[in-house]
UniProtKB/Swiss-Prot annotation:
Belongs to the anthranilate phosphoribosyltransferase family. It catalyses: N-(5-phospho-beta-D-ribosyl)anthranilate + diphosphate = 5-phospho-alpha-D-ribose 1-diphosphate + anthranilate. Its EC number is 2.4.2.18. The gene is trpD. Catalyzes the transfer of the phosphoribosyl group of 5-phosphorylribose-1-pyrophosphate (PRPP) to anthranilate to yield N-(5'-phosphoribosyl)-anthranilate (PRA). It comes from the Bacteria. Homodimer. It comes from Vibrio campbellii (strain ATCC BAA-1116). Binds 2 magnesium ions per monomer. This is Anthranilate phosphoribosyltransferase.
Length: 336
């Protein structure tokens, strides 16, 4: 192992970027629990200070996917809608809520998530409060995607090896490459993804990373401080289509909506969030809350080939108003 790891660590000390293969080798050793914690901290720090390249991120993601527990991958188009978290704004659980609304609009979603990073209640905390089984088997999860159109893959169940990095990450108390890997390592391996990132500087590099992860169609977004499509300002988008990246900006008007202040979509602790999300999914939320979810669903629908954002937004709002989106929450809770 030293023959593999020493040249990689030396390269990082010299602030040289790793090839995708070298990054994959490094993270393979980390995930198998074979790297000394001091060396791991050194490598993660060197990567952070240098700035992780798309090759390094893709290599790390491929190592984690190669070591993940298996999932029976659907042979149809299906998506993940996910944010890195860590934007520090504690909004309502937009992407989790949007997953149910997207399914009510006819899309297939296999959402990968974990406990909270930035909101007081992460997606798994919220699903837990609705009685959705986070420990559902891979087979049952796949069946839920087939039959209900939406299911949730809880990261620790598939990525046990990440625990080897936890003590180092907790001691370092700073963002590392692991903070951006979560959305790239969905064990179901979706071919469509809407991914929000906590910094505008990450939009292009993450899109370049996704290009190497053989996505059919994807978009990376940062919305005026949020790791989501914004309803309070502009959203920077890098979209992957036909193997090319197109960058553009979206505003609430592009979705046919009025802007709303960021304060209007603040979240709470899990119990409060449960009430807020129930209201949204039954059409009883505020215009800001419904809009915040609808714009994210609308962009995800575009990735499935429904290009008209305004029509998509209306369809998403209707799926909430009709209560159809909330029925899927109940179906998923009853599924296991």
């Amino acid at each position: 192992m030293e023959a593999i790891i020493n040249p990689i660590i030396t390269k990082l000390y010299e602030q040289e970027s790793l090839t995708q293969e070298e990054s994959q080798q490094l993270f393979d050793i980390i995930i198998r629990g074979e790297l000394d914690p001091i060396l791991m901290a050194s490598a993660l720090t060197a990567l952070k200070i240098k700035g992780e390249t798309p090759d390094e991120i893709a290599g790390a993601a491929k190592a984690l996917l190669a070591n993940a527990n298996p999932f029976p991958r659907p042979d149809y188009d299906f998506a993940d809608i996910v944010g890195t978290g860590g934007d520090g704004h504690n909004t309502i659980n937009i992407s989790t809520t949007a997953a149910f609304v997207a399914a009510a609009c006819g899309l297939k979603v296999a959402k990968h998530g974990n406990r909270s990073v930035s909101s007081k209640s992460g997606s798994s905390d919220l699903l837990d409060s609705f009685g959705i089984n986070l420990a559902m088997s891979a087979e049952d999860t796949r069946k839920a995607v087939d039959e209900i159109g939406v299911a949730f893959l809880f990261a620790p169940q598939y990525h046990g090896g990440v625990r080897h990095a936890m003590p180092v990450r907790q001691t370092m108390k700073t963002r590392t490459i692991f903070n951006i890997l979560g959305p790239l390592i969905n064990p179901a391996r979706p071919n469509i993804e809407l991914m929000g990132v906590y910094s505008e500087e990450l939009v292009r590099p993450i899109a370049e990373t996704m290009l190497q992860m053989s996505m059919k169609r994807a978009a990376v977004v940062h919305g005026s401080g949020l790791d989501e499509v914004a309803i309070h300002g502009e959203t920077t988008v890098a979209e992957i289509k036909d193997g090319k990246i197109t960058e553009y900006t979206l505003t609430p008007a592009d979705f046919g909506l009025e802007p709303h202040p960021l304060e209007a979509i603040k979240g709470g602790v899990p119990e409060e969030n449960k009430a807020i999300i129930t209201n949204i999914l039954t059409g009883k939320g505020t215009d800001a809350q419904l809009g915040a979810v609808a714009v994210n669903v609308a962009l995800l629908m575009r990735l499935f080939g429904h290009e008209d954002l305004k029509a998509n937004t209306q369809q998403a709002v209707e799926a909430m108003n009709s209560g159809e989106a909330y029925q899927l929450v109940q179906q998923l809770a009853a599924h296991a």
